[in-house]
């Protein structure tokens, strides 16, 4: 069974576009593991481990206009798909993730 006409309802954006959305007030959710989060994360992000989100997605209170981030953009794309399935609008996957953030020389926060 082909599903080619199934539309993906989240945007896959790189660092410059993500930074603009953050300035516009988008929520940033980091879905990496605790040890990764503790090494440093995008300033202002909140932390929900991907498996926790997938186990009970509706409990996480994801709002419209959310950017999901992980190390590179793979796990965050899974979270983005789940958010869209929950009916969240204007979902963005940060393609490049915290690696791109650090590579650009941008600051990170630690808990």
PLM regions and their residue ranges:
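Rhodanese-like catalytic fold shared by cysteine-dependent sulfurtransferases
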Residues: 1-27, 34-66, 74-111
């Amino acid at each position: 069974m082909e599903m080619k006409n199934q539309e993906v309802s989240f945007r896959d954006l790189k660092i410059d576009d993500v930074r603009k959305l953050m300035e516009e007030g988008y929520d940033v959710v980091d879905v990496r593991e605790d040890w990764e989060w503790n090494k440093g994360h995008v300033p202002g992000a909140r932390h929900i481990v991907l498996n926790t989100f997938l186990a009970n997605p509706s409990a996480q209170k994801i709002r419209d206009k959310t950017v999901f981030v992980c190390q590179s953009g793979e796990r965050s794309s899974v979270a983005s798909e789940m958010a869209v399935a929950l009916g969240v609008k204007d979902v963005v996957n940060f393609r490049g993730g915290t690696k791109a953030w650090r590579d650009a020389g941008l600051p990170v926060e630690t808990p």
